[in-house]
Amino acid sequence: MARNPFRMFPGDLPYYMGTISFTSVVPVDPSQRNPTTSLREMVTTGLIFNPNLTGEQLREYSFSPLVSMGRKAIFADYEGPQRIIHVTIRGRSAEPKTPSEALIMMEKAVRGAFAVPDWVAREYSDPLPHGITHVGDLGFPIGSVHALKMALDTLKIHVPRGVGVPGYEGLCGTTTIKAPRQYRLLTTGVFTKKDLKRTLPEPFFSRFFNQTPEVCAIKTGKNPFSTEIWCMTLGGDSPAPERNEPRNPHSLQDWARLGVMETCLRMSRRGLGSRHHPYHSL
């Protein structure tokens, strides 16, 4: 699996801009068990050769995609099974940007993330966003009308308010969640702080989490036993240590926040409604 783009590595641009996420489908190829590597390379190629970005902008900004597989899906108008794919792209910049500047740049990057053939664009009933149609392998391959509709319906751009601060390395953890017996087919593999805000009471949320909506968990895998594996992330309060220096231990409050996020994530994936709030009594 590709490296986690929610962690900082040496050489990464320091300032975090936001994330682009969408869900689509690709045909199931029996000879290729894990297509995430090739799909990630296609998305990266489409972002690099995006006609809306100049060479100077490509040096000033970086976009790191993460591709994970979902469950299989069968459509009535298509022969053969297909695989649901979740794509998340994280953007960074060399200089601090305002939220409006970051949003404009993320919208430009979206136009290079898809590879839509002409016949799919012609058969699609609704108008396409400007500049999103590209012919060839430059971007995520859209091979059918329902794949394009799914990608556009689930397309989200997350730009936090505090994009002018360095993206310090935060606390990461994984959790395994049993999939519910019945749930909607088109489910995005992203869990945001907006979802936390809907689950937690306002005083509790304000005391433990920032108000900026950003991605805090993403589904990274699904095993044959109908369970999902999610990677949860929390922004760090202090910069990451330099090389060969000891790491600063995370506080007990950070570990408590990670546990709260895991509980809310489990509730969301099991389909519990707004009446189930285990933290309202605190």
UniProtKB/Swiss-Prot annotation:
Annotated Gene Ontology cellular component terms: host cell nucleus
Outcome recorded upon mutating residue 258 to P: Loss of antiapoptotic function
Disulfide bonds: none
Outcome (variant: residue 258 to G): Loss of antiapoptotic function
Compartment(s) where it occurs, according to its Swiss-Prot or TrEMBL record: Host nucleus
Keyword Ubl conjugation listed: no
UniProt entry tagged with the keyword Cytoplasm: no
Motif BC-box-like: chain residues: 251-260
UniProt keyword annotations, A-Z: Activator, Early protein, Host nucleus, Host-virus interaction, Ubl conjugation pathway
Subunit structure: Interacts with host HDAC1. Interacts with host E1-activating enzyme (SAE1/UBA2 heterodimer). Interacts with host retinoblastoma protein. Seems to form a complex with host E4F1 and HDAC1. Seems to form complexes with either CUL2-elongin BC complex-RBX1 or CUL5-elongin BC complex-RBX1. Interacts with TCEB1/Elongin-C, CUL2 and CUL5 in vitro.
Summary of the function given for this chain in its UniProt record: Early protein essential for viral replication. Strong and global transcriptional activator of both viral and cellular genes. Activates transcription by blocking host retinoblastoma protein (RB) and inhibiting the SUMO pathway. Inhibition of host RB leads to the activation of E2F1-dependent transcription and, in particular, of E2F1-regulated S-phase genes. Stimulation of progression from G1 to S phase allows the virus to efficiently use the cellular DNA replicating machinery to achieve viral genome replication.
Note on domains (UniProt): The BC-box-like motif could mediate the interaction with host cullin RING ubiquitin ligases.
Record's protein name: Protein GAM-1
Organism: Fowl adenovirus A serotype 1 (strain CELO / Phelps)
